[in-house]
Amino acid sequence: YAQIHYPFENLKEFDNRQIYPADFIAEGVDQTRGWFFTLHALGTMIFDSVAYKAVVSNGLVLDKNGNKMSKRLGNAVDPFSTIEKYGSDPLRWYMITNASPWDNIKFDIDGIEEVRRKFFGTLYNTYSFFALYANVDGFDYSDPDVEWSKRPEIDRWILSLLNSLVKDVDGYLEAYEPTRAGRAISDFVNDNLSNWYVRLNRRRFWGGGMTVSYTHLT
């Protein structure tokens, strides 16, 4: 309730059940008899309703050898220095794609660097490649979309894979499977987009006249 400042704000949306009960909540497995239960108990007593429709019970973050982190053992990782060094997005992506939320994760700093290099580095290089040649050719983002039948087969192939990816990721997220969603996105970027599409189309970009491809790459 505090997240939406109820009952001091958002009364109408809350009372009309637009934002309550919550679609899902996420906490550590240790909250099964704590927060998970307390929210339902309060919701039932006050509103005669469950407090949430689904729950994601998070596992524990262990060290890379599978041991519980502890200052005493010297295997704890400082999250603030880690974010400062590697960035928050690589850290998030590493944790999302490493293991399902309900499983324990063996945390390895080297894995964050690998994610930053392989996924984010590849994504950045792909965008930089597109931006370079789109600017050289004077591509206008306001140009109308190119008809499907006028697109080269390889362009239709990557678009088909992208549409399939969107459908699959939506399904994974609806089923509370963020790890499968993240891995599907990583595979698309690293394999299909970078290794196949960009590599096979380099000569087309170098030769100019790439309005068709620029349009769908945006």
What do the PLM-derived regions correspond to, one by one?
Residues K150-W157:
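The feature captures the catalytic groove of carbohydrate-active enzymes
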Residues T215-T218:
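Conserved small/polar residues in nucleotide/adenosyl-binding loops
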